[in-house]
Amino acid sequence: MYTNIPQQQQNIPQQQQQNIPQQQNVQNIQQPLPHTNIQQQNIQQQQQQYQLQFQKQQQQQQQQQQQQQQQQQQQQQQQQQQQQQQQQQQQQLQQQRPQTPQQNAQQQSQQSQQSQQQQASLGQGQQGSGPNTPPQSQPETIESIFKQLDLNSTGQQAKDILEQCKLKIHSLESQQLIAQAKYKLFSLAANYQSTVFQHIKMVSTTTTPTSTPTTSTTNTPQNSNTSSSSSTGTSSSTIGSSSSSTTTSTTNNENLGLPISKEIYQQKIQLWISIITFLRENLQYFGKWRESIYISIQNITQSTLLPTLIQKEFFTELFILLKSIFSFVNIEFPHYIALKEVKLSNTHQCLEYQNLIEPYYCRAAKLSSLLSLSSLSSSARIVGSSILLNQDAMIGYTNQLTESPPFFTSNRLLNNKYSTIVHHLLSQSASIEPIKELLFPQVQSNTLKSKIISIITEATISKTMQLLNKYPNQIIENQIENNSWKEWLLFSEQFYFLCENGLVDLEQFIVTLSEKRMNNGDPIKDNMVVLLISKTIIIQDVKTLFKQHLQNVNSNHYGHLIPLVLSFVNNDSNYPIISQNISLYFFLMRINTNTENPEIIAHIKKLLDNFNFQFTLFQQYRNWWESEKVKQKPEFFTTIQDITYFSIICNVIPTEGEMELIRFQSNGSDQSIQFPGVGGIGTVVTGKIKPVSNLILLNLSLRCRRKLIQESVLLLLDKEVPISPGFLEDYCRTVHYTPGPVSPFLFSYFKKFHRLAPIHAVIESVSHRLLKVLKSNKELAVLLRALQDIQTQKPIQNIQLSRSIDYLLLKASISLPVDLISAKEIWKSLDLGLFNNRRLITSIARLIKLKGIQDFNRISDVPVFIENCFKSNPYCFSKSTLEFFPDILKNEFKKNSENLSLNPNQFTNLTLMKPPTLQKVQLENQQRFQLFSVGGKLQILQKQALVQQYLTDNNSNLLLCQVFIYMLENKIKMDVMGPLIQQMFFKQIIGNQQPQQQQQPQQPPPLAISNQQLNRITSVFIDFIFDEVYVNHPLKQENLHQHVSEFLCQSIFTYKILTLNSVLLALLDRDDHPSMPTILDTFLFSSAEIQNRLQFFSTYPSDFFISQSFRNDDNYFIKNCEFNNRFNDLIPTVIDPNTLIEQSTQDTILPIYYSNSISRLMPIVEIIISKSIELNNGDLFEKTINHFNIPYHYYQDEKETTIKDTLIYYYDSQLFKLNPELKLLFLKLLNQSDIDNRFSNIFNQFLKSSRIEDITMVGSTAYFNDLISPLAEMMDLTNQNVFDTFSFKTENTFSSIDISNPLELKLNNIILEILLLPLDSNWIANGLVSLLNYSNRNKNFSDRKIDPPSSSMVLALSIIFSILPTQIHNSFIPIVTQNLSNELNFSKFKSPIMKNQYNFGNYTTNVEEKMTEPIEWYIYFIQFYYLYCPLERLLSLNDLVTNIRPLIKNVYQYYVLLTIVSPVLLRFGTQTNHLIQITREMLQILTDSYLSSYIENTLQDLESCWIGNTNDDDDIMDTTNFNLFGKRIGYDDDDDDEDDDYYDEDDEDEDDDNEDDQQDENDRMDFSQDTNNIFNRSMGDHDHLMMMSNSENLNDPWSDKNEFFRKQKSIFLKIDSQLIDTIIDWIYHIKMIFPFQPFRDELLRIVKEFKPNFLSKFNQLN
């Protein structure tokens, strides 16, 4: 892959490798083959020999061809005779039956075709031959020559055929043909050796060789790609790309498994050896190094399946091949290719094989460790999958080297670690998606999948045991409200989904769980386990599993699983009989329904009798059910007893429970419901108002809930009349409680669009209840496409529906999830309208600035969307808004402005719909004064003329401006113009001059102006106010503010020409004008209309709307109807000018379920808060929160997340810098009853006293330690019961709180508290970083020896910093850089041992995950910070590398920096300039004078055989089992009395107890005291080593002639050589994985600047 073999090296001596001894020592094999002039001369001589041999071979071929031609001529004559006989027979038949001319023609054509085919078969390829030329043989190809090889060929025949193929290749003229032929020959040979190997293996396992020959051969086809088809890895696809067409044969005796002769057996072995020898002798000729390694390793692994007598012979040949391949490493191909294949291999028990593979295996493991995140890489998934960073595509925590997840081998420590993680996810109430994301990143191997499934199964067993011990012997009856039932219910849902997706081995679960014991030592006897298993029996795979165990039935038992399940039944007399009956009956009845065997049914009856099953108890439930389901119930089961009974019925008889609930939802109540309407008259529907109890919905089986959703959708969309509000709320809550996609059931109906009422009901439910579900399911893109299709297909005539869709788009656009940016197809054509497009751009800016977007390529389509929006309506955001945009969006707007030749400093509305000038409006008013003064009493013809005149965009934009000027100049009052504008905007005026059209039934007349046009008119009108009236009208601005506010209120609330949302959005889009805040203040906070609507909330108890949310208010619909009946703002109306009666603009008034004018105002409130911060307007900020805090708390879906994002986005705003106490106003938007539990005690004390000294006096370190420690404890993997203290209120888990996960909630509260602190960023940054500074090297040892931070604390800090705003980032990065510099400087005297090393043949992991060195947790902290931080902050990693660069003096220090950078490198994208920049920074460090000299001197010392000249290699310390920081892995240090604490190596005064504790908790270095002293005084200072090596005093311990020093220096050189090797491997690796040509060019340019010895390691990089 890396190597382009020169032409002069393609012909290699055939016998170059034949003289390698089979028993040669592995350590002597790896000497490189030098490139010398002698070798080139030999190659030229051998080329001449090949030519002579080829000429001889051609002469022999010509003789053979002549003989074949003679034989073919004889065969042709025989065939011609046969053909003549056939023709004579056909003529006789034709004479007997006459034929038509068509049949004669067909017969002649068939005869000609047969003759052509015969000629082609006799002489194919005879081009240019005359008619009398005898037929010639077909030209030979590689395939035709290779076909001569079959399973009956001898070894010598195989060798001759392969050499003949090779000679044929040399006869080709084109280099391209030669290359193709070489690849073909290698593929044929590789595949055929696999075929022979599999044949030998098959014969060896089914036959016994004897001395009696009994063979008879027949040619039968056989697949030659047997082994390669079953193999894994990338090489298998390469080798198996072309299969051999050779036909092979086996004897009948072989197929029957009878004895065969030893001669035949040996012939097959020699045939295989000949092919392997040919491949070995032509390694350089083919240049297929990676494929050759794969062949050898794969066959070595399979050789263990052969009989013992022949294993040695096969292994020897393969081992010689493998040694020959590895002898060319770094000569003909880079070591990186060997690393990739070795990493995928399984180990062999042979010591020779281990000695050969181990260096490469360990080297591959070291590179894999470098590319992976440090230490707790997997625990980051626990937080990363759940916290609100929205990392939808995480960095690979596993082995990037082999492009596969970690190999789950027999190492139980590693498996238990991942099992613990899954258990932790289950405890967080996580769905199966984070679990799949954790363990299934591109898994292809079925074996690996089974191991992962086993790990998940162990996690479910662990979770089951946790619940069993937490709630021992819980009864099923009367516990429906207890936390135990809710936790079991939640886990049963998770367990069901895992089983449904095939992620749990149920058989393993049952068998293993039956072997477990409770904490008190008793066996498991709990009916909850039986109920847990019973729920999964409806899954098809589970049905199949139990059916397999129901086949063999006898009098005692059937199968082994069912008795194990029944062993969990608790039929103790002290246990309630009803509880055991429920679980037992539930399980056995479901088993019974899956079988038709009468013996099994009888056996189930017998089992029930054995358990003293009491059918009378169920008869009692049955009687209750029969009586209840015929009753007419105003409400559906409200008492706890009835809910418990119904839950039992739904689990035992699910169909009847479903049907009864659906029947009740559809028409279960005779109560009449009147929706809001016009004039107090609205649509009347019969149904129920309140939803059913949450307990009923939660206790339904999953099957019932899914069925209920499907049936509800059908009733919702296909019903002619509107559905009841209780039914719709039941549907929404069921969707919340049932994980799964929503869009397939709802949005497919939008395409029909023939019933407006159900579509409006869906829009209402999605806007207020299901939007969060769609976002979590990543279905928001589907929703936006569906809504856009509705709007683009045809104008929506129902303006009420159109405005509801506008509100849904607004709400979706201001809270985009990060996954929507990945939906690339949507951005190229997305258009949500004038106002919503601008909201989308603002939301994108927040996402880029706040969230940890994966890489720069993810936002590549966003500029396309911005460009399209700018073209359709060129709008520039104000300077105050652009100030907070990320740089990438600022540059986009600057570029678009330059393309339109606009001034980038001009922050006015640049819309193409320019407002009319004031002079033009006044002129139009003068001309139409007499007409408009009549108002709505105009004649029909006059109204029609006006409508036609104002239908065009320009004139329609002019109309509203004219009306405002009339009112402003007091010429025509609004009560005259209002009704006329209503009729012109909302109705087509039809006169009486067309009576013939009225005789036919007509559809409602289309609107004169659509809602989209009204939005544009609103925007133009606001522009007219700011750009024309405020500039050119002589009226004072104070009076203008009041007139504008009055006109807007009348247009919105009295005449409903405009909508409140569109007017506010248009005003907020003009934040560049200084009068906008004043108008907004007057309009929002001084107008009586809005104040009256806000006062509605005071009619209820003062704490009602604060104590709960509309999402869990069963009486919400009643309150909402009361509001809409009092303030009918959502139904567009017109006023009849004659009767002055308000009428609807449309025949159909759509039912309103959730909306009102104030609830739809909540997204606008968030925008106003943001604008007030941008404009540094504290008065507007305070007024907005004080006026709207109650409805905001009641209606808003995600308060905590929204407040947190706002504080982060605007953290460095002038408003909060000058008035930091204003941030505390956000607390008014939260639930006041939860504040004490939400924040820390110190912060709560500060809120009560308002004295900041309550926090500062405590100290930043103590304050943040108290704040973050609870989160670190929750993230600790070692505590599986960490969530036991939390009460799972399941009915609130999905719908009633913003964040359902307790870990998410805790993290969010910590972030919120830090952001609300009225303290500067430096104080916060220093306090947080101080939690990492557990040592001060300037103090004595006794003052420095403090326990290091836990890994979960470091992880929590890194994630908290990544979420906190950029201002804090700018404060803490210099601190962390300085601390890392100090540790790197100190590390010159520490052990540069590689971290997380792997033992050969297995993985070792730091399971306890203890960190004892400061540099450990700084690596860990910085890695995860840059993994999660927002995209723009990622570039600061370049600055960190630049600042650290001057301190890099040795290889170990560079390796530490590389450990930080390499796992995060993928976040820079695969084809970006940022990737080139960070890589350039890292590689140029290697060219610095000090480090390059250090590397060069180290390589020279290695060449001088420092390691090899040591007398006793056993005395040299084995560094494989040490990690990076001097910790020994996998060794028992109980016998070592030395304290290895890094703080003080010479400490002898420590207490023995402390030393014992240190030994128990942490792994320690296995150095002696003297070794430590010398090691620490010399390591890392190469000049010091060179100085010591020049000493001539033999008694000097630093003399290079001192044996002890030589051994120590050998250790250091070996460690440095390992680090240098890993750095080399990393450079090869990044060159492989980033196919970006500018990147590769820059990499090669820098590599060429390396010094000679180091540069020689990259000969194969090109």
Curated annotation (Swiss-Prot):
Q: Which residues form a coiled coil?
A: 39-122
The annotated regions of Low complexity compositional bias extend over 95-124
- Location(s), subcellular: Nucleus
Domain of life of the organism in this record?
Eukaryota
Does the keyword Protein biosynthesis feature in the UniProt annotation? no
- Sequence ranges of Acidic residues compositional bias: 1532-1560
Keywords associated with the record:
Activator, Coiled coil, Nucleus, Transcription, Transcription regulation
Q: Where is this region: Disordered?
A: 1-24, 95-139, 206-252, 1530-1572
Record-linked InterPro entries: Mediator_Med23
A GO biological process this protein is involved in?
Answer: regulation of transcription by RNA polymerase II
Which Gene Ontology cellular component terms are annotated?
A: mediator complex; transcription regulator complex
Q: Does the keyword Transcription regulation apply?
A: yes
Name of a matching Pfam family: Med23
Where is it predominantly found? nucleus
How does the record describe its quaternary structure?
Answer: Component of the Mediator complex.
Q: What family does the entry list?
A: Belongs to the Mediator complex subunit 23 family.
Q: What does this protein do?
A: Component of the Mediator complex, a coactivator involved in the regulated transcription of nearly all RNA polymerase II-dependent genes. Mediator functions as a bridge to convey information from gene-specific regulatory proteins to the basal RNA polymerase II transcription machinery. Mediator is recruited to promoters by direct interactions with regulatory proteins and serves as a scaffold for the assembly of a functional preinitiation complex with RNA polymerase II and the general transcription factors.
Q: Which PANTHER family match?
A: MEDIATOR OF RNA POLYMERASE II TRANSCRIPTION SUBUNIT 23
Provide the protein name: Putative mediator of RNA polymerase II transcription subunit 23
Species source reads Dictyostelium discoideum
Q: What is the lineage of its organism?
A: Eukaryota, Amoebozoa, Evosea, Eumycetozoa, Dictyostelia
